[in-house]
Amino acid sequence: MITIEQLLDILKKDHNFREVLDSDGYHYHYQGLSFERLSYDSRQVDGKTLFFAKGATFKADYLKEAITNGLQLYISEVDYELGIPVVLVTDIKKAMSLIAMAFYGNPQEKLKLLAFTGTKGKTTAAYFAYHMLKESYKPAMFSTMNTTLDGKTFFKSQLTTPESLDLFAMMAECVTNGMTHLIMEVSSQAYLVDRVYGLTFDVGVFLNISPDHIGPIEHPTFEDYFYHKRLLMENSRAVVINSGMDHFSFLADQVADQEHVFYGPLSDNQITTSQAFSFEAKGQLAGHYDIQLIGHFNQENAMAAGLACLRLGASLADIQKGIAKTRVPGRMEVLTMTNHAKVFVDYAHNGDSLEKLLSVVEEHQTGKLMLILGAPGNKGESRRADFGRVIHQHPNLTVILTADDPNFEDPEDISQEIASHIARPVEIISDREQAIQKAMSLCQEAKDAVIIAGKGADAYQIVKGQQVAYAGDLAIATHYL
């Protein structure tokens, strides 16, 4: 429960309070109301709900529906003049985060918080950290792929970083379940729209940066994207940073006065020997590590997670065991066809991650290589040119372009746009299952491989704003083995 007096105090301390308006006029103080629930969904309110009117597309009709259901007061940046009191604020998203934090009893203070950011690798690094910490603690995890609040039950996440009301409700449930640590993926969008406003992490990890999520409904420029990624560093007590990433020198200057540790080529924490399923490291994680996920970049993700978990209480033995146990749905999953050709299923969904995926496969498979690829509709339009650029740099690759969450766009138009950036013929088969079946039929020898990129473990396609059932890349590939 939270009282009107408590929430006004929170807003005033954050300099985010304008006034309370009701039929009697302007009020600096207000009293007599308390709330047992928080919501931003007008369909889920009653007389004991504190409602947040948020979003550029919010309509007064939503508020009228809530009032019909008994709503007594709402928080908003706008007075909709509907006859009930309104708490006016300058920034509704910041208000949501701080009020949710207090409403749920500040659960962030009862958990050790570990956050990963980066253009790619967040989910893999989070899984590594989860398995490391699980050896001696009770970690919860909020991940793009899966979320667990109790270490037993896993469910699919809707957002990389949940909305603040949901985030703190989930944190509170983690505390109730006896969890000791929370591992989170924190997207640039989470900072852009203040989902984690006011939250300080015990350790923040910056894995890498490359142009992505740049478009009309995401970040207008790379500078804006990079800036919002860096906010995790400002909001972490200690940081772990990849010294091999672009713009590392800037980040090193930024965190000079913070507790920090670097890994990668310009640091003391490096991978010295790398094999397909093992690596040796020097520095704070010195030793031998077995790993199920192939690729040097996955080994670096394991290093990043290990350095973070070391600070959070994990032992080197915990880290070694955790790395050896980690598998990630839809990340570098490998199948073998009856003719011994390989099928690789991976979530690679931007130019940089595609380049790394192709390089790893080419290192191990020297025959015919078939790539199945698409790009999502109505988001991340810059990826299409990036995909074309990467494919152009791999001339021995045979490419079939297909649907990958086309949303409100025509998947063939998206494929044609990708193809326009490739200086050789490619095939377009918009039906993703047919594309996979054809590619697999063309691989006949053990040295051949099919690479299915983009969707990973997703068992749906996003079409016209809706999730449409799709068997999933791994299930389809398994069917045609």
UniProtKB/Swiss-Prot annotation:
Entry EC no(s): 6.3.2.7
Pfam families: Mur_ligase_C, Mur_ligase_M
Segments carrying motif L-lysine recognition motif: 404-407
Pathway: Cell wall biogenesis; peptidoglycan biosynthesis
Origin superkingdom: Bacteria
Main location: cytoplasm
Residues bound to UDP-N-acetyl-alpha-D-muramoyl-L-alanyl-D-glutamate: 42, 158, 160-161, 187, 195
Binding site for ATP: 118-124
A molecular function (GO) term: ATP binding
UniProt keyword annotations, A-Z: ATP-binding, Cell cycle, Cell division, Cell shape, Cell wall biogenesis/degradation, Cytoplasm, Ligase, Nucleotide-binding, Peptidoglycan synthesis
N6-carboxylysine PTM sites in chain numbering: 229
GO cellular component: cytoplasm
Keyword Cell inner membrane in annotation: no
The reaction(s) this protein catalyses: UDP-N-acetyl-alpha-D-muramoyl-L-alanyl-D-glutamate + L-lysine + ATP = UDP-N-acetyl-alpha-D-muramoyl-L-alanyl-gamma-D-glutamyl-L-lysine + ADP + phosphate + H(+)
Family according to the record: Belongs to the MurCDEF family. MurE subfamily.
Task of the protein: Catalyzes the addition of L-lysine to the nucleotide precursor UDP-N-acetylmuramoyl-L-alanyl-D-glutamate (UMAG) in the biosynthesis of bacterial cell-wall peptidoglycan.
Name of the molecule in the record: UDP-N-acetylmuramoyl-L-alanyl-D-glutamate--L-lysine ligase
